[in-house]
């Protein structure tokens, strides 16, 4: 019972050794994934494993971490096999939790180098007024420069991205030379970065669709579980509302930084709701509630930030 009452902030015994190698323990991974599972998710998962987990074990499940611990006690998950956990997360359409099903420790948060650089260099553009000038001068008309808005490139079908098909025929010597020059970019040339945006619409809950439609009369418990599992998987796949993947090209660091902050604080999600959750989609799903999931790869943002930061450093050079 003491193990069941363990808090998420406490350190598991095996984690003290694995921390030295930059790894999470299996139970720490259960803590991370389990805290993001809602009570509705846990009820759906328990419903799928009603024939595998006995009544006593099922009565101890209070949250997502308890369910994952029950899977471990049933031999369905260990340090070398996360297949069952990954498959269950896909069935309940919690694709946002798939990156957390790993023992590799995530990198610690470091200070924002962009903010630090902008703060240090902003003093160069502040010129205090001379004390000998008592009257304010009329403002000089500034030359307006059109901002470099990001370019969005969305796939037209499947996972195919917006790429030009190369022309057929024999390549000339001049084109080969141009291609060689394009491989090695000019160090003074302005760099751009691509940020991949994934948007997915899905139902808020699937219990009403699963109840009454998942049934098996097979005698063997394992066969009965697989049949129920396949039926639930087919139903959830039929309720897939689809997704879209976009590549957004940035050439200015300020726009990239503002885009990332809007993604973190939820402003991007609220703005995309009016674009993707249309009246036709609401009419297609009927009275069921739907939600929008937005994902931006953090590694793309960090790599893009380094490229655009290099542009600022080149501009600061004399």
Curated annotation (Swiss-Prot):
SUPFAM superfamilies in UniProt: DEATH domain
Annotated DED domain residues: 25-103
UniProt note on tissues of expression: Widely expressed with highest levels in testis. Within the testis, highly expressed in germ cells but not expressed in Sertoli cells.
Matching PROSITE patterns: DED
Alphabetic keyword roster: Apoptosis, Cytoplasm, DNA-binding, Nucleus, Repressor, Transcription, Transcription regulation, Ubl conjugation
Origin superkingdom: Eukaryota
Disulfide partners: none
InterPro entries assigned: DEATH-like_dom_sf, DED_dom, DEDD/DEDD2, TRADD-like_N
Gene Ontology CC annotations of this record: cytoplasm; nucleolus
Places the protein is found: Cytoplasm; Nucleus, Nucleolus
GO biological process: decidualization; extrinsic apoptotic signaling pathway via death domain receptors; negative regulation of protein catabolic process; negative regulation of transcription of nucleolar large rRNA by RNA polymerase I; regulation of apoptotic process; spermatogenesis
PTM remark: Exists predominantly in a mono- or diubiquitinated form.
Residues covered by region (Disordered): 128-191
Classification via SMART domains: DED
KW Cytoplasm (keyword) present: yes
Entry function: A scaffold protein that directs CASP3 to certain substrates and facilitates their ordered degradation during apoptosis. May also play a role in mediating CASP3 cleavage of KRT18. Regulates degradation of intermediate filaments during apoptosis. May play a role in the general transcription machinery in the nucleus and might be an important regulator of the activity of GTF3C3. Inhibits DNA transcription in vitro.
Protein name: Death effector domain-containing protein
Organism: Rattus norvegicus (Rat)
Name of the gene: Dedd
């Amino acid at each position: 019972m003491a193990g069941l009452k363990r808090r998420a902030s406490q350190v598991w015994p095996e984690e003290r050794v694995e921390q030295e190698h930059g790894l999470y323990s299996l139970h720490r991974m259960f803590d991370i994934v389990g805290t993001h599972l809602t009570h509705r998710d846990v009820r759906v998962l328990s419903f799928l494993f009603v024939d595998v987990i006995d009544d006593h074990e099922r009565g101890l499940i209070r949250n997502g971490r308890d369910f994952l611990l029950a899977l471990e006690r049933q031999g369905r998950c260990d340090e070398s096999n996360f297949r069952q956990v990954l498959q269950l997360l896909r069935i309940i359409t919690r694709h946002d939790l798939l990156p957390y099903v790993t023992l590799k420790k995530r990198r610690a948060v470091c200070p924002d180098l962009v903010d630090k650089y902008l703060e240090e260099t902003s003093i160069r553009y502040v010129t205090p007024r001379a004390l000998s000038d008592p009257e304010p001068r009329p403002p000089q008309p500034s030359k307006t420069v059109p901002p470099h808005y990001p370019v969005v490139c969305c796939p037209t079908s499947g996972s195919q991205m917006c790429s030009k098909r190369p022309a057929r025929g024999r390549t000339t010597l001049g084109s080969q030379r141009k291609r060689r020059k394009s491989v090695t970019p000019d160090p003074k040339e302005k760099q751009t970065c691509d940020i991949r945006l994934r948007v997915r619409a899905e139902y808020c809950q699937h219990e009403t669709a699963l109840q009454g439609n998942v049934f098996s009369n097979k005698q063997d418990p394992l066969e009965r579980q697989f049949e129920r599992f396949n039926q639930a998987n087919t139903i959830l796949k039929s309720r897939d509302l689809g997704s879209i993947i976009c590549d957004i090209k940035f050439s200015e660091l300020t726009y990239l930084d503002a885009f990332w902050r809007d993604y973190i604080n939820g402003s991007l999600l609220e703005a995309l709701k009016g674009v993707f959750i249309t009246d036709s989609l609401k009419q297609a799903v009927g009275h069921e509630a739907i939600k929008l999931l937005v994902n931006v790869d953090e590694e793309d943002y960090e790599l893009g930030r380094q490229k655009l930061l290099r542009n600022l450093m080149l501009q600061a050079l004399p």
